[in-house]
Amino acid sequence: CMFSLKTGRTIPVYLVDEEIYAKCPTVIISTVDKFARLPWSERVGLLFGRTDRYCSRCGHIAIGEKHAGRHNADVAAGLEKAETVACKQFYPPELIIQDELHLITGPLGTIYGGYETVVEEMCCIEKNGKKIRPKYIVSTATIRNAGEQIKFLYGRNEFAQFPPSGFDTRDSFFIKEVPLPTENLVDASEEKISRMISDGKKPFRQYAGICASGQSVKTTLIRLYSIILQTALDIAKDPEYEDYIDPYYTLIGYFNSIRELGGAVRLLDDDIASRIRVVKNKYNSSEQRYLSFEGKKEITSRIPSWEIAQVLEKLAISYDKNKKKQGCYDVVIATNMIAVGMDVDRLGLMSVVGQPKQNSEYIQATSRVGRQHPGIIFTVYNPYRPRDLSNYENFVGFHSQMYRYVEGTTATPFAARARDRVLHALVVSLLRLQVETMADNGGASNINDISDEQIKDIKDKILERVKITAPSSYVDTEKEMDEFINTWKNIAKDEKLYYFVPTIADDKKRLLTYYGEYYGDKEKPTLSSMRDVEQSSTVFYWEGV
């Protein structure tokens, strides 16, 4: 390998933002959360090839970025002298691949769609008087009204779908409906069963609905978990089936909220363990299943990311009947974090408590099991919730054609409240990344020095997207941009203005401030992340004396 240690070279993979900017890599893997950094730094332009200088010590320098022409040697730090030389710009990204499109919806999709205006504009190139835009490839397994979603997010009225709609619902290219074998497989040879599995003739996932009228969901959950866990151990002790129990020895519990999951944590520590003893005595099992502390884990937002990675890695550990190595998990409970990214082929058993808010979430979550081996999902419905009861009554019909019930996704990038959050950020981003004198942090003061044509060009690029995605908001969008730019010009007339300074000083005024921080009348709160785009409110209850 050309990157082996013998050659003294390392793999050219960079993780820190500043390193990525300096190297201008060919391939960038990122989350959409990074879009929020567009108005905050001129160095973001390096991701789009906007460089005009190269420093042998610091890497590529962004257009408009202030940088020393040379660096003296630093013997103590082991650094040689370095010079900055001129270089050509790179082409911007030509291909953008977006995975899990169905997740970019609601508030996140609305904010994302706004910033996508800047991303696409920065990826465009002019050739022979023609504007060449980047190509998008987006993937999703569960989406409806994809054309509308693509128009709102990417401003494209036309798109090609692969695979296209077929002639037979039993074959959609990625999924084929295979009838279950009619012959008795109990006495079938192991060779025959293996051949059927290799041919793909096996059931994929089986769904079972449970709705216990007159009982609480917690009671149902206690009884379901205890019988599943104890039965798995009983089967594991049977010599005839001990080699096939692995996919069903670890139970994945799926919950719709942290509150519901928190109740299940307490049940696992107490009630379920006690109920397992009852089940063992009732069915005269040879051995009781005990749930150790290490055998119970959760995958939620309240668990550190490094610990989640360890849990996912250990989930791949198979059941060891001889117990000569570290055992697999007994129960792993989770929220919708596992709906994306948990790819463990050995899993085959899941319990879902309550119908998720979106059917696409239900499909994505339950598809975590039954990948390599036949899977079974137990869905526990709350009889006191009308929606759960309705889904239970239509259980067979719904599960026979789940993809027909996927809801359409929504995104409104230029709605009134969305404009409050991102419209000014789009203006700042395009000015900093496309006008050289506006790029530097102190360039915010130069708003009065650039021509009206340059400002109009920036506005037109945003309004062009508004025409496609939200034509009814065109007038309001133009008016609000004019108001923001006029306010910006008035502030810059009186004093030196910066885009952002970490702390408010008497001699430094800033145009932007972090969203959620204290800000003055002349500062514009701006998102620095899209991880929490919905602002929370604190409610106080006061009782008078």
Give a label for each model feature.
Residues 25, 33, 47-69, 87-125:
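SF2 helicase catalytic motif II
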Residues 390-408, 425-545:
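The feature captures the C-terminal accessory region of ATP-dependent helicases
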Residues 100-110, 119-151, 164-165:
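Conserved helicase ATPase motor motifs in RecA-like P-loop NTPase domains
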